[in-house]
Structure formats: C-alpha cells, structure tokens
Amino acid sequence: MMELQGKFLIAMPHLDDYFNRTVVFMCEHNEQGSMGLVINQPTDLSIAELYSKLNFMMKNDRTFGNEMVVAGGPVHTERGFILHKNTLNAFQHTYKVTKELSMTTSADVVETLGSTFAPEKYLVALGCSSWGAGQLEKEIRDNAWLVVSSNDQILFDMPYEDRYAAANQLLGIHPYNFALAQVGHS
C-alpha cells in the first residue's frame, strides 16, 4: 500500500470537475480509505468572518490577517477541519497526521484562533475530500493525481493562487508543460 498520509496530491490537468488545478493535503490514508483537504481553493469567507458567525466572544486581542477559509472538498461541506502545527494544547477531537501536523474538528481549536493560544500555523477548511478503500490508488494509477512530499511553506504561507504551480515545481514540473502535452490530443 502506498504511503500517502502527509503528502500532497496534485490534480492532473484533465480533471475538469471540482478538483481542477487543486492541491490536496492528505490527512489520512489506510485500508478503509483516504481523506484530505484541498489547500488552494479559498472561499469568500475570511477566518475573521467565520469566527464572528460562530458567535464566539470577539476579544480585542484577536488578529486574523487576510486568511480565508478554504473549500476543503465536496464532502461534509458544513463541517470545519483545522489543519495545524502540533501544539501543547490538547483539543477535544484532534488526529495526528504527521510528526509536526494535526487535524482538529472540534470548536475548541477555533476558540483559540487569532489569539496567542492558537497553533503557530493553521489552515481552516469547510468540507473535505474522501475516497473509499482502493479508490484513490486506482485514480493515481489512472494518472488523475501526482504525489509529492508536502511542504509547510506551500501549505500555510503561500498565496492560494500560487500553490498549484509551487506543488508542481516540487516535482520539477512547470504547469505550462501540461498544456503542451495536450496539444494534438482530442
């Protein structure tokens, strides 16, 4: 079984549906199936707006910057998933993804966002991407996805619109090359 947890999946150009030009960070991969978060499709909802919609007490010491909530995938689109650097804080529903990263689905992590108690780096997603047993492996064999080691700079710090090209460049691929490969094929 291939080891995909903690890796990026890069959508091949022929994926023309929800996953067109996406990068997915894989949070879980085992015999039962796979789950990940699209990291480069921002919604029009900022983290600050999400925070206020959830009716958390807005405190003066909260700063959110320009971070947006991303559309993590077409499954459970009403649920929040927070991918973050590991912390000393114990959140209620946290799953360790890698040595450095965890995913939390409980509101207690949201309560810390924008404060000094927040994880050092985090990505807030609504929805996730999931595959049944063997489904993702088949899609990879069918050349729907490229797999590459993840990179914290791409995951947390890079502008959303640059993440697809940057993930491809981890493999030495310029996305323009895909367009050339499609010429003459119908």
Swiss-Prot record:
Disulfide bonds: none annotated. It comes from the Bacteria. GO terms for cellular component: cytosol. It holds the Pfam family DUF179. Gene3D superfamilies: VC0467-like (3.40.1740.10). PANTHER family: UNCHARACTERIZED PROTEIN YQGE, UPF0301 PROTEIN YQGE. Belongs to the UPF0301 (AlgH) family. This is UPF0301 protein NTHI0415. It comes from Haemophilus influenzae (strain 86-028NP).
